[in-house]
Regions:
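Conserved acidic donor-binding segment of nucleotide-sugar-dependent glycosyltransferases
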Residues: 325, 335-350, 358-363
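A short, active-site helix/loop in glycosyltransferases that binds the activated sugar's phosphate group
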Residues: 149-197
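N-terminal strand-loop element at the rim of the active site
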Residues: 10-17, 24, 30-69, 181, ...
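Acidic anion/phosphate-binding donor-loop and adjacent secondary structure
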Residues: 186-189, 197-220
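A conserved mid-protein helix/loop that constitutes part of the nucleotide-sugar donor-binding site
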Residues: 21-26, 221, 230-245, 262-268, ...
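Short His-centered aromatic/hydrophobic patch
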Residues: 92-98, 115
Length: 396
């Protein structure tokens, strides 16, 4: 497939705050450098949270008001829009049920599914939501728990595997974030060699800052959390639990939590109830570059992550990450031997607290990990990612 002049469509449900949405934006800019036109499609667009790149080769179209993504109506609408724009490749970076891929392939359009999370992440998410004791009155909690258990029962693991097997058979390329994820999918879905050959590996890009990062010894003694304040995946409440264990040992350190989400009110109440010192909820920030420059350590406390975009962003800025060893993506970024940060056994809060305390008190360790992490980010530079896309397009 000829790359220069190629027209590609990327479809999301919405363009707003989110790692996958940010990666799509970065990818469109990379495509532009290759002479590829990118056409974004979505139901909604939050301009304050997601900015369309100012580039003549990149545009955004919203579905007609009231039209839902991946219905018969929207599938026909998209096929017409693709034909009008000369789209040859559709990239789907979201995990929505889609029964209309055969219709799109019948129009002569190649399909790439881009999985931004760990394999079968939905099972973990459903488990966490089903066991979640919401911070609400008991009657709301009972209703919520009953509803989630019902949904869990109706959406079995085998149904999910069947859906993914069908998806593999309906796309021309299935992208995962790490080689380990490919093996997990092949094993979990029982795929044959032909089906396995459709997989490709594409890590997320990392961008080194324009200016040399501040050395670890000169950084403010500040611990950061950057991400959505949600329970099932990000678990920001663990940050508070861990900080409670170490705050008295680290009197000259502070914690700043950046993000917004459903857990914000609970976190504020928890901070007040436990009277946790030197920890602040800072709210949503559109560009975290300045935040990373002001911190020394990034805490990730997620139950599951596909990649953890904030990990590579922090590493590129010289911030040392610490995270639970909960996925291959996190291991890829931090290193199985904690070469580029600190890995902690899931989900041992005491072990996490011990590692965090050590990291805060040992500036030489922080310096060594910071330098190693910055070098590691070169493996995910735009130049290296570009060559991977060129290989994928050449094989379609």
């Amino acid at each position: 497939m000829e790359i220069k002049g190629l027209h590609v469509a990327i479809v999301h449900r919405r363009f707003a705050l989110g790692g996958a949405e940010e990666v799509s934006r970065q990818t469109a800019c990379l495509f532009s450098d290759l002479g590829i036109h990118t056409h974004f499609f979505a139901e909604t667009h939050n301009e304050t949270e997601w900015a369309l790149p100012d580039d003549p080769l990149i545009d955004l179209s919203l579905l007609p008001q009231g039209m839902r993504l991946w219905t018969n109506e929207s599938a026909l609408y998209l096929v017409r829009a693709f034909k009008e724009r000369g789209v040859k490749v559709l990239i789907i970076p979201i995990a929505l049920r889609n029964d209309y891929l055969p219709l799109i392939r019948a129009a002569g359009i190649k399909i790439i599914y881009w999985c931004h999370s760990s394999p079968l992440w939905e099972l973990i998410d459903r488990r966490e939501r089903a066991s979640y004791k919401a911070h609400h009155p008991w009657y709301k909690n009972l209703y919520s728990l009953t509803l989630r258990r019902l949904r869990l029962a109706l959406s079995s693991a085998e149904k999910l595997r069947t859906r993914y097997r069908d998806l593999v058979g309906q796309v021309d390329c299935f992208i995962t974030l790490t080689p380990e994820y490919v093996q997990e999918f092949v094993s979990a879905l029982g795929l044959n060699d032909e089906e396995a050959s459709r997989f490709a590996v594409m890590p997320n890009m990392a961008f080194l800052p324009k200016h040399q990062p501040i050395p670890a010894k000169d950084r403010p003694k500040k611990i950061l959390f950057v991400g959505r304040l949600s329970y099932a995946d990000k678990r920001p409440d663990r940050v508070l639990q861990i900080w409670e264990k170490v705050c008295q040992d680290l009197p000259d350190w502070e914690v700043e939590i950046y993000g917004k989400g459903s857990e914000e009110k609970f976190l504020r109440r928890m901070i007040q109830r436990k009277q946790l010192p030197r920890i602040t909820l800072k709210g949503y920030i559109a560009d975290a570059t300045a935040v990373y420059a002001s911190g020394a350590i990034l805490m990730m406390t997620s139950t599951y992550e596909g990649w953890g975009l904030v990990l590579s962003e922090a590493q590129a800025s010289g911030v040392v990450p610490i995270a639970f060893d909960s996925s291959a993506g996190i291991r890829e970024l931090i290193g199985k031997d904690s070469t580029y940060g600190c890995l902690v056994a899931p989900f041992d809060l005491d072990a996490y607290a011990t590692q965090l305390r050590r990291l805060c008190q040992d500036v030489e360790l922080r310096s060594r990990l910071s330098q190693a992490a910055q070098t590691h980010c070169l493996d995910y530079s735009p130049e290296r990612i570009r060559s991977r896309w060129e290989e994928i397009f050449s094989q379609l």
